[in-house]
Amino acid sequence: MNNPKMPMFKFLILGLSFTSSLCMAQQALVDQAIKAMGGLSKLESIHTLQYKASMKQWEPEQSFEAGGEMKFASNSNFEVKRNFDEGLVQVDWVKNFVYPTTRTYTFSEVVRPNAGYIAGIESNTRVKQNKESDPPGHTMSSVRLAVAHREFARSSALLLIEMKRHPLRVQACADVLIDGVSYSALKYVLNDQRNDQVFTVIFDSTTKLPLRVRTLDYDNIHGDVTYDLVFREWGQWGGVILPSKMSYEFDGRLISDVDVKDYQLNPALSEANFSIPAKLLSSAAKPAVGMINFQWPIRRQIIGTLIDSDNNAFDMQAVSDLALTPLAPGVDHQSRGSANSLIVEMKDHLVVFDAPTTDWQSKRTIELIQTKYVGKPIKYLILTHHHMDHAGGFRAYAAIGATLVVGSSNVAHFKKMLNAPYTLNPDLQGGSLARTKIIEVKDVFKDSDGSREVSAWLLENTHAKGMLFGYVSDVQIGFVTDLWAPGRDQIKGKLNATQSQLAKAVEKAGLKPLLFAGGHGQTAPYSQISEAQ
């Protein structure tokens, strides 16, 4: 007698068998890698770890030419202490920066499960708490802490042990092609409660060791990108195989090169190594959840300019919001942020100079503009140059139909960026931006309504190829980014190189500005420049 339930029963058995085989294959990759690193017992015996290392770093979006040679940023030496049982990390840093200026910062970084702390000065742009503390120090923002948690999990010597302990968070993954070679890989979800932080762990088919740990991130210029920790060389310490040379790759480009000098397994580490001042700990931020722009805090640390705030645009301890500051009728300076825009009203539309930091800042600036200039569309977004801190919010303007105006040689770059997917953007979700119009400025761009003329002039300079500066003729107001920070940069005696370049460009254009507003800083009389020549 036929049993109608038997085919379904057989199907379920086959399904369970397939799932079991798949799980076994996943676990085999993890087990092989653990064995290659010295074996399960050796790795599980590691409770604390200490090592010294040196690092070189480059920043791709501060290049002279868009998409060109990366700017060398810093040489660093650091020492890491980790308590794996408690989830504690301390890093003592000496960072020697050469960009954007030459300086050295010596500081310590403490990361705990529910708080982070910086002891000392790590950035040009110090937050309010750091400035007011004696000695200088501040607790990490929730975004910074979440980034630190992810990155220390990525580089953990015990990542494979965590994968073995949490098999339900290990997922099958298609092989990954790197330089024409196919490698086995697994996905690993970092947290049971969240599914937005996932590593792709890629394995070397010959050594069985991990080859890369990859994440998919959002970059404010490039859109969706890969970010890889690459294990280049390994060594043996106390019977355990650990990485001796590592690098970090941003969308396939090397931006950090790390050389580990020594590992100490299970050193005695004091709780004091991981302490946070009690008066600050009680109000310290917990790690952020949800979609996070990981690349911004990672990359701003590379050049030592991170504002350690949950808002990339400004220090939330010191500033509550962006604002429009009137400079003249129909001319506003979007200020209070780390980087600024200039807004100019025409008869039937608006012109905006620069889209700093992220699409959040652009969206907030657009809200302020639409509240003040009701019903007037933003027709042009004029980008002074391609650097991420002044162009990173360009997608929000493209999404509302603005035409991009860029300097000579930058059109291909921005066309490519407008075609790039941006599905991981925490501030903007939408469709294709590929049809956005772009105007190239080879000498000067002018927009006139019969009463007012706005212009953008190409400027020969040493900071960025295709640099533009802006001018509003009827009120004699200029706009400049990076070459001079009006109201911030004190001019004493002779002009520096970039200030001289601005002065020459203004003279060549035959302009007579009275005031300049800055992409950094505030405003200042142009006489500060003209009288110092």
Region roles according to the model:
Residues 263-347, 444-445:
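Zn-dependent metallo-beta-lactamase
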Residues 32-35, 40-127, 174:
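N-terminal mature ectodomain segment of secretory-pathway/periplasmic proteins
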Residues 502-533:
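Divalent-metal (often Zn2+) His-rich catalytic cores of metallo-beta-lactamase-fold enzymes
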Residues 10-21:
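Bacterial N-terminal signal peptides
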Residues 324-371, 467-486:
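Conserved beta-strand hairpin/beta-sheet module of binuclear metal-dependent hydrolase folds
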Residues 175-278, 471-473, 480-481, 486-487, ...:
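Gly/Pro-enriched, hydrophobic low-complexity segments
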Residues 28, 35, 101-198, 207, ...:
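Flexible, processing/modification-adjacent segments and terminal tails
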Residues 360-405, 508-514:
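Active-site metal-binding motif and surrounding structural segment of the metallo-beta-lactamase
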